[in-house]
Design a protein with these regions (language model features):
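Compositionally biased intrinsically disordered regions enriched in Thr/Gly
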Residues: 2-173
Length: 173
């Protein structure tokens, strides 16, 4: 849905998505590349502020968890005989960014990506879909109707079939 909606041209929105915090650098053993968004919504609407609070909490928690994991790993590394010279090669890369998938006077679809890599890697995507006019979060049911699950399943199966026809080695999980 968001991918298709992102292709629609938009002029004169009532809402904006701006970079609230941007940082690139090193803090301790963590290499950071962080861009945190803030939603500036239509006056009198509460949901953009709630979404901003959730985004701030999500990114703060993710950064804190990454720092905690790195500190625990560092402690274990030295407790098991690792040296400072060996440790010098170890860092964690932490990445936080956002992407406006769709924005009009009525709807905002925003994705926030959080990722870290070091011994292992993980990446998470969190999406916020806002009905700006009615000040509520949009669900698939709101957009597609009561039969949204069947519509989604049909679309997914169709996309898998198309990709498999184009590439016999494609795999899906």
């Amino acid at each position: 849905f968001a991918e298709n909606m992102s292709k629609v041209p938009v002029v004169g929105q009532l809402a904006q998505v701006l970079t609230f915090r941007s940082f690139e650098g090193t803090e301790g053993d963590v290499e950071l590349n962080v861009n945190v968004p803030v939603v500036k919504g239509p006056d009198g609407k509460e949901l953009p502020a709630k979404v901003n609070a959730r985004i701030q909490q999500l990114t703060a928690d993710y950064e804190a968890q990454a720092e905690k994991e790195m500190a625990e790993y560092k402690e274990s590394f030295f407790q098991t005989g690792g040296t400072k010279e060996e440790w010098a090669d170890r860092t964690m890369d932490l990445y936080i960014d956002y992407d406006v998938k769709y924005l009009s006077n009525d709807v905002l679809s925003l994705g926030v990506t959080t990722a870290k890599s070091w011994v292992s890697a993980d990446e998470e995507h969190t999406y916020y879909n806002i009905d700006l006019k009615n000040d509520k979060e949009l669900t698939l049911q709101d957009v597609l109707g009561d039969d949204y699950a069947a519509i989604c399943n049909k679309s997914i199966v169709s996309q898998i079939e198309e990709r498999m026809a184009a590439d016999a080695n494609a795999s899906f999980f």
